[in-house]
Amino acid sequence: MDISNEASVDPFSIGPSSIMGRTIAFRVLFCRSMSQLRRDLFRFLLHWFLRFKLTVSPFVSWFHPRNPQGILAVVTIIAFVLKRYTNVKIKAEMAYRRKFWRNMMRTALTYEEWAHAAKMLEKETPKMNESDLYDEELVKNKLQELRHRRQEGSLRDIMFCMRADLVRNLGNMCNSELHKGRLQVPRHIKEYIDEVSTQLRMVCNSDSEELSLEEKLSFMHETRHAFGRTALLLSGGASLGAFHVGVVRTLVEHKLLPRIIAGSSVGSIICAVVASRSWPELQSFFENSLHSLQFFDQLGGVFSIVKRVMTQGALHDIRQLQCMLRNLTSNLTFQEAYDMTGRILGITVCSPRKHEPPRCLNYLTSPHVVIWSAVTASCAFPGLFEAQELMAKDRSGEIVPYHPPFNLDPEVGTKSSSGRRWRDGSLEVDLPMMQLKELFNVNHFIVSQANPHIAPLLRLKDLVRAYGGRFAAKLAHLVEMEVKHRCNQVLELGFPLGGLAKLFAQEWEGDVTVVMPATLAQYSKIIQNPTHVELQKAANQGRRCTWEKLSAIKSNCGIELALDDSVAILNHMRRLKKSAERAATATSSSHHGLASTTRFNASRRIPSWNVLARENSTGSLDDLVTDNNLHASSGRNLSDSETESVELSSWTRTGGPLMRTASANKFIDFVQSLDIDIALVRGFSSSPNSPAVPPGGSFTPSPRSIAAHSDIESNSNSNNLGTSTSSITVTEGDLLQPERTSNGFVLNVVKRENLGMPSIGNQNTELPESVQLDIPEKEMDCSSVSEHEEDDNDNEEEHNGSSLVTVSSEDSGLQEPVSGSVIDA
C-alpha cells in the first residue's frame, strides 16, 4: 500500500482552547450546573460592591453642597497629588543631570574640569541649611568686630584682641559636613578668614615706630603657637600607596602642603620624597619621576621564593627597596633634610620585641638617623620584608648602626650579638597623632587613608551617611567605636590575637580624611610593582579625592598659612637688618682703625646644638647663609608654609656639638655658671664709657668667675688694644678665661703655646684670625617658641641698655669685654 495515498488527519483537542473557556470548564466540573456558577459569581460581586460602597460613601459625602470643609479637603488633596506627580519629569531630568556631573567629576583629569563639573552639580543640588552645621551668628558678629577694629586703625588694639581670641574652630566652622560636596568655602567663613589674614598682613607690613620688628615677630610666634599646627599623615597600603602621590601633588599645586609630614610603611616613602626636595624639585618629580617608584623585586621561581622564606622569613628581598630609597633621598639624615627644606619629617617604626614601644623618628628624636634606613624599617611588614636595623651617621659622617649590638644570651656567655631591629610602623601606630601633638604642637590632621583593611570600612561609612542621613551616620560611628573598644579589651586581656586587634584599635581618621576608592583589581595587585598606567590611575584617584576636600582644608588652614607667611617675612627682614648692622659695624671699625664692638648674645637658657656649633667657623658662614637665604627666597613664593629657613648650618655640616673643642666646652660651662645680679643687668648704660655697676648697685659673682678672675689678674694689666679686628679664633687646646672689669667682662683667650709661660707683654702684637662670636638665633619651631621669646626679650634689652667695648689681642691672649646685661645665669 502506498503511503502517499493515505488520508491526512487534523490535530484535535479535548475541551476549550482559550484560557477563559478552560477556567469555566474547570469551574463547571466542580459545580452542579451553570446556574450554580452564576449564583456564586453574583454573590461574590455583591459582597465586594457593598464593601466598596461602605468605604467610599464617607468620602463621597464630602462633595455634598452642605459640607464645604469636605470639598476644601478634597480639592487640597487633588492639588497636592497633581503637584506631586506632574513634577516627576522635571525631577527625573534633574537627577539625570546630577548623575552626569558626578560622572564628569569622577573622570576629570584636571582641576579646571573638576571645578566646572562641581559648580554645575552645586547648582542642581538643593542648598543645605548651613545654620544647622555651624554657628553662623557667632562668625558674623566676630567678622563685624574685626572690621570695626580695623577701621579704628589701632595696631595695638588689633594685636591685643587677636592674641586673646583667635581659634581655628570658631563656631564649629571646621565641621566636615559643612564642606562636603562644596567647591568654595561658605561665604561668611571665607570673609572671616580674609579679614583675619588682612589684619595679620597689616601688622606684618606696618612701618610705624609704634611696633618694633622684635615685637611683631614675638606676636606672630605666640599667636601661631596658640593657634596650632597642621600635619599631613600618610597611611600604609603597599602598592596602593601611589594614591598618596596624588594627594601630595594636589596640596603642592594649591600651596596647602603642611610643614609637618609623617607616615608609615609606603606612606613613609612618599613623606621621605617630599621632605627631601624643594618646591621645583617636587613638581619635577611628580611630572617625570613616578616610574621610579618600584617597591618590590622580582619574585623569581618557586624554589627561590621557598629558599628566601626559609632563610629570611620574607617573601621579597628588601635590597631593591633600599636601592630605590638611596636614589631618592641620598644619605640625608632627618636633621639635614630639615635644614635643607624646612619640613619636619616623621616616620613610625615598631619593634619585634614585646616590651619596646613604637617610635616616631624625626629631627628631634633621632636627628642623625639616615632617612632611607628609617623608611626601609617602616616598610618591613612581617612576611613581606625582614625586619631592618636603623643606620645613622657618626661624627665623621660614616654610616654606622644606630643602636650598638647587644649580647643575645648574656647568662650563657655566648659571643653572638645582634642589633636592634625594627619593622612596619603601621602594625601599632599607623598615624602618629599623639607623638606629633606632644613634639610639634599639632592640633589639626589631614589624613590620606589607603590601608586595604581600613579604606573599605570608611567608604561604607560614607555611603551610610550619604543614603541614611545623620542618624544612620551616628549609628555607623557607634559601631566603629564599639569595634575599637572590643579590640582594646582584647589587648588588655592579652589574648593571642593581640596583633590583629592592634590594627583595628588605632585611629583611622583625622580632621580631614581622604579615603582611597580602591577597586578589586587594585587589591589583587597589592604586593606587586604597579605599572606606569596603574601609578597614574592611583595618582589621579588621589587628586580627585583631594579636590573634594580643598574647601575644608582652605577653611581650616587659611589663618595658619597667613601666620606662616607673616613669620617668614619678618624673619627675612630680621636677617636683612642683622646683615646691615654687621656691615655697618665692620665699615665703621675699619674707617676709624679701632677694634670692632663684637657682642656675644647669650640667653637665659643653654643654646641648642643647632645654634652653638660655631667655634670652627671662619667668619663668613653668616654671610654665606644670608646670601643663600636671599637667593632661595627670591626663587620661590614666600607665601608657602615653609619659608622659615634657618640662619645657621646644621651641626651635621659644621661639626656640631660632638666636635667641640676643649676651650669651647669650658666656655659653655662658664656661661652656664654665671650668676649676675639683676641690678647689674639693669644698671648698664648705653655708653661704652659708663660704669658697669650703677650707684647703689651690688654684684655677686659666681665662684667660677672669682676663680677665673684670680687666675688672670696678673696678666690683665699688660693687655692693651691691638690692631683692628672684627672677631677672634678659638682653636683646639686654647684656654678661654673670663674676667670682670669696670665696664663689662673680659674673655681672655690664652694660646696653647703660651700655657705655662709667663706674660711677655706687648712685644709682638699679632693680627688674630677672623671669626664672629655673635650667634644669630636659629628660628625655633613650635615646640620651643616660649624659649625663643625669651631670647627676643634678651635681644631687646641688649639693644636698649648694654654697653659694648672693644676687642684686644696679644701674644698671651685676646680680651673680649662682653655686656653683662645679656649674660644671665
Curated annotation (Swiss-Prot):
Residues 714-726 have a biased composition (Low complexity). It is found in: Lipid droplet; Membrane; Peroxisome. Disruption phenotype: Not impaired in germination, but much slower rate of postgerminative growth. Broad optimum pH around 8.0. It catalyses: a triacylglycerol + H2O = a diacylglycerol + a fatty acid + H(+); 1,2,3-tri-(9Z-octadecenoyl)-glycerol + H2O = di-(9Z)-octadecenoylglycerol + (9Z)-octadecenoate + H(+). Residues 632-653, 801-812 have a biased composition (Polar residues). Glycans are attached at N129, N327, N331, N601, N616, N637, N800. Gene3D superfamilies: Cytosolic phospholipase A2 catalytic domain. Keywords: Glycerol metabolism, Glycoprotein, Hydrolase, Lipid degradation, Lipid droplet, Lipid metabolism, Membrane, Peroxisome. Its EC number is 3.1.1.3. Transcript levels do not correlate positively with enzyme activity, suggesting a post-transcriptional regulation. Belongs to the PLPL family. This is Triacylglycerol lipase SDP1. It comes from Arabidopsis thaliana (Mouse-ear cress). The gene is SDP1.
